[in-house]
């Protein structure tokens, strides 16, 4: 066990984490030259295209160090985006050390700081590595100082490397061997294995990635999942090199996969503990929290025939994604669908893209909302993640909205514009520190403002250099109202939203103007209104199409013309009473995209 090293890499998007892992695999001969491709571990197409890591992956490599000994390196790749911080905390729970990879040209970013603190809280040895030193703009000394000032880790003499051209990769491996502690644990104790990740394979069923804390698990043995108490038999186990390599057993300190023919998605929940069926351990591996969705949205298929496929697709995805929540929902405008809970906006976009791409579904997503608390006059507290759960306005004493503490790191040239957008989003400044070239700004912001389009706005005003990390800190009372959209007097449930009273008129006007352009003209007038309770705050009218009924009259008597015009008027009136307005899908999509 003294020659095992379990570590993961903490890095911001684009700081070269996946490239560095490619180099590790190359140096340790994990794959042949023919099988090597860029970003080996980012196995989903969408991960490659966006250049981000979403799922945690693992690789076991044998490295012969300069001291002549062979070490088993278990490397768990982690995502860098704030939405996937739960994947990060899970991966870190299986390690003893973490490499903090920082781009020597760009410096420290907010999400790196957050993940780094998670690692320090879990008592991991954090080792700073400066990557991309081949770039002409690299300033390793300045960045090392930034790491010390912002994160508080000693970065003097930090290992430098360039993963892209392969300089210094062996130095990084030597640093891992020297500084990451060997795992603790007893091979002869009762089995305790932590499930880091589970995914569904069409041929094998559920494949679980586990870190054995104590004991040994062998092929053919029976084990049970502690939270459910159900027992299974091990069909296959082994490690990823990154290909699947079968072994006879996994012992304490090792990381590998287990296949036990589990068919049910929830049979091996992520974060659970496995133990022997006949000689179980008493306590599960600690340090695991259930993740709560932060953003909710309704998802509907464009054609109702796809509903069963949609349900199956969500069930399969939720196996690979412990943080996805969904329940059935019915909307008058959009039909049957699901109310889904996500960690954040990127998570929502990625789930939608995976559903559309991997399962060929056409989806509409309703406007994202967060969880509000409605306190009724009788003292009852209702958690509102869906507008249909909101009580009548007369019964509500107050509505509380979630507030997040946002840490924003930006180059000092952009401070003014960042403060401006924070104020526009109803933010309250908590702190502002200058650290070298960077400025760390802390704001308390309403969560709904952060999840709608704050990240995009931040990126555009800081030319892409701003980075953001946020966490929910409290709920506080706010003057929120429900903004309904009426078309010819009928409410359209899919377009309703909860907004702050100060912004309601502006939002309502913007919404009706946008709908006016999107709803095609009918044979009768269409009134589009935005309302708060019984008060109309904005209105716009789609004018009627008009057929020229006088065309066949030529000269003719004026009373004859009047009669025809009156008849047309009557018809339009009747049509308006009974005609229903077809709202095209594009109208929903473009309104909800905002």
Curated annotation (Swiss-Prot):
NCBIfam families: lepA, small_GTP. It catalyses: GTP + H2O = GDP + phosphate + H(+). GO terms for molecular function: GTP binding; GTPase activity; guanosine tetraphosphate binding; ribosome binding; translation elongation factor activity. Residues 2-184 form the tr-type G domain. GO terms for cellular component: plasma membrane. Its EC number is 3.6.5.n1. It is found in: Cell inner membrane. CDD domains: EF4_II (cd03699), EF4_III (cd16260), LepA (cd01890), lepA_C (cd03709). This is Elongation factor 4. PANTHER family: TRANSLATION FACTOR GUF1 HOMOLOG, CHLOROPLASTIC (PTHR43512:SF4), TRANSLATION FACTOR GUF1-RELATED (PTHR43512). GO terms for biological process: positive regulation of translation. Belongs to the TRAFAC class translation factor GTPase superfamily. Classic translation factor GTPase family. LepA subfamily. Its main location: membrane. It is a peripheral membrane protein. The gene is lepA. Pfam families: EFG_C, GTP_EFTU, GTP_EFTU_D2, LepA_C. GTP binds at residues 14-19, 131-134. Keywords: Cell inner membrane, Cell membrane, GTP-binding, Hydrolase, Membrane, Nucleotide-binding, Protein biosynthesis. Required for accurate and efficient protein synthesis under certain stress conditions. May act as a fidelity factor of the translation reaction, by catalyzing a one-codon backward translocation of tRNAs on improperly translocated ribosomes. Back-translocation proceeds from a post-translocation (POST) complex to a pre-translocation (PRE) complex, thus giving elongation factor G a second chance to translocate the tRNAs correctly. Binds to ribosomes in a GTP-dependent manner.
């Amino acid at each position: 066990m003294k020659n095992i090293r379990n570590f993961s890499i903490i890095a911001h998007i684009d700081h070269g984490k996946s490239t560095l892992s490619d180099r590790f695999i190359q140096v340790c001969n994990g794959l042949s030259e023919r099988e090597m491709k860029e970003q080996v571990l980012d196995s989903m197409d969408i991960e490659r295209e966006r250049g981000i890591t979403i799922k945690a992956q693992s690789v076991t490599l044998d490295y012969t160090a300069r001291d002549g000994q062979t070490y088993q390196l278990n490397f768990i790749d982690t995502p860098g985006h704030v939405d996937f911080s739960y994947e990060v905390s899970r991966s870190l729970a299986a390690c003893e050390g973490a490499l903090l990879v920082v781009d020597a040209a760009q410096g420290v970013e907010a999400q790196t700081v957050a993940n780094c603190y998670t690692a320090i809280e879990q008592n991991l040895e954090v080792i700073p590595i400066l990557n991309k030193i081949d770039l002409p703009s690299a300033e390793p000394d300045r960045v090392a100082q930034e790491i010390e000032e912002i994160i508080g880790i000693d970065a003097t003499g930090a290992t430098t490397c360039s993963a892209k051209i392969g300089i210094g990769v062996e130095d990084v491996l030597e640093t891992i061997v020297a500084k990451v502690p060997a795992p603790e644990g007893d091979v002869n104790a009762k089995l305790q294995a932590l499930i880091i990740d589970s995914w569904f394979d069409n041929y094998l069923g559920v494949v679980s990635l586990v870190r054995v804390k104590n004991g040994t698990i062998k092929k053919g043995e029976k084990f049970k999942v502690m939270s459910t108490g159900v027992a299974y038999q091990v069909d296959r186990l082994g490690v990823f090199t990154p290909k699947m390599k079968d072994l006879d057993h996994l012992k304490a300190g090792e990381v590998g996969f287990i296949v036990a023919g589990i068919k049910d998605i929830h049979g091996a929940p992520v974060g659970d503990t496995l133990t022997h069926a006949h000689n179980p351990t008493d306590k599960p591996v600690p340090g695991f929290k259930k993740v709560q969705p932060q953003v909710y949205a309704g998802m509907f298929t464009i054609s109702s025939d796809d509903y069963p496929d949609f349900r199956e697709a969500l069930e399969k995805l939720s196996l690979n994604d412990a943080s996805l929540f969904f329940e059935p929902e019915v909307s008058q405008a959009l039909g049957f669908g699901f109310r889904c809970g996500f960690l954040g906006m990127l998570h929502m976009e990625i789930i939608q893209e995976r559903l559309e791409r991997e399962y060929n579904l056409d989806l509409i997503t309703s406007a994202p909302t967060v969880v509000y608390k409605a306190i009724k006059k009788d003292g009852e507290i209702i958690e509102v993640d869906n507008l249909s759960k909101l009580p009548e306005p007369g019964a509500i004493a107050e509505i509380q909205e979630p507030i997040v503490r946002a840490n924003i790191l930006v180059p000092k040239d952009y401070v003014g514009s960042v403060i401006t957008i924070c104020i526009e989003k109803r933010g309250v400044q908590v702190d502002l520190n200058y650290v070298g070239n960077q400025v760390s700004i802390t704001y308390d912001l309403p969560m709904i403002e952060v999840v709608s389009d704050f990240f995009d706005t931040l990126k555009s005003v800081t030319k892409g250099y701003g980075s953001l990390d946020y966490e929910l800190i409290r709920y506080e009372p706010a003057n929120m109202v429900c903004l309904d959209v009426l078309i010819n007097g009928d409410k359209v449930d899919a377009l309703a939203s909860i907004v702050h009273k100060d912004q309601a008129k502006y939002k309502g006007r913007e919404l009706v103007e946008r709908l006016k352009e999107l709803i095609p003209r009918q044979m009768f007038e269409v009134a589009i209104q935005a309302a708060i309770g019984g008060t109309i705050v904005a209105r716009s009218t789609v004018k009627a199409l008009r057929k020229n009924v006088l065309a066949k009259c030529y000269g003719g008597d004026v009373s004859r013309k009047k009669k025809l015009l009156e008849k047309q008027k009557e018809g339009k009136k009747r049509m308006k009473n009974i005609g229903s307005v077809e709202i095209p899908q594009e109208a929903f999509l473009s309104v909800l995209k905002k």
